[in-house]
Swiss-Prot record:
Sites where the protein binds Zn(2+) 1: C20, C23, C38, C41
An example Gene Ontology CC term for this record: RNA polymerase I complex
ZnF (TFIIS-type) intervals: 83-123
Gene: POLR1H
Cited PROSITE patterns: RNA_POL_M_15KD (PS01030), ZF_TFIIS_1 (PS00466), ZF_TFIIS_2 (PS51133)
Domain notes: The TFIIS-type zinc-binding beta-ribbon domain contains an acidic hairpin motif (residues Asp-106, Glu-107) that likely coordinates the nucleophilic water and magnesium to cleave the scissile phosphodiester bond and release the mis-incorporated 5'-ribonucleotides.
Domain of life: Eukaryota
ZnF (C4-type) intervals: 20-41
Species this chain originates from: Macaca mulatta (Rhesus macaque)
Annotated GO MF terms: DNA-directed RNA polymerase activity; nucleic acid binding; zinc ion binding
Protein name in UniProt: DNA-directed RNA polymerase I subunit RPA12
Role, per record: Core component of RNA polymerase I (Pol I), a DNA-dependent RNA polymerase which synthesizes ribosomal RNA precursors using the four ribonucleoside triphosphates as substrates. Can mediate Pol I proofreading of the nascent RNA transcript. Anchors into the Pol I active site to monitor transcription fidelity and cleave mis-incorporated 5'-ribonucleotides.
Amino acid sequence: MSVMDLAGTCSSFQSDLDFCSDCGSVLPLPGAQDTVTCTRCGFNINVRDFEGKVVKTSVVFHQLGTAMPMSVEEGPECQGPVVDRRCPRCGHEGMAYHTRQMRSADEGQTVFYTCTNCKFQEKEDS
């Protein structure tokens, strides 16, 4: 038997039963069928190979803290660094800003400015 013949009959990986021994993908849990089939490459494992294997799952719920209500003056848009920019509504010098990636990743960010005096907002695409 040649090496090429052996390659077709044995798997590429030596792995735990959680993973496909042919391509390395995570295997689905055994069901009512006689074999467990890898959803990626179609490699089959006899379901009897899984006898005695215990599957344990657990769900942990973490208690959430209480949310503190924000007043209008203390909202997230009023926080952040302040730049020397004149508010077009009230003329106040000084606007807080924050940035967001609103468009596709290969385009610039959108800068949101908020007047620290009258809370007027404007945006600028950079």
